[in-house]
Amino acid sequence: MLFIEYPKCSTCQKAKKWLEINGFKFEDRHIVEDNPKREELKEWLDKSGMPLKKFFNTSGMKYRELGLKDKLQTISEEEALDILASDGMLVKRPILIGDDFVITGFREKEWEEKLKC
């Protein structure tokens, strides 16, 4: 599994600890130092079945500064993916990617269901 995080994020820290406590092996990736590429984001979006908005860090400063709440309603998926790929701080985190799933954010129950704990 691939675990994409911002190490200073308390939710990411909690999710990482949860993975470790539950014995899951994962590759760790820093979302700012190694920002997801547009192609990766598109692949994850398709695999997840989630709406594109779920990939945006809607509580982040950058999201608010760019006025994305209103912009997202009027731009294409391609434009939105380009925006996400431009800055890791715009991307919802953590992201957990497995062979057949993609999860954004950390909600313990959802992770338990996906990982069949």
Protein language model annotation of sequence segments:
Residues 1-22, 26-29:
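Local sequence-structure signature of Cys/Sec-based thiol-disulfide redox active-site neighborhoods
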Residues 33-117:
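Thiol/selenol-based redox catalytic cores and closely related redox-interacting motifs
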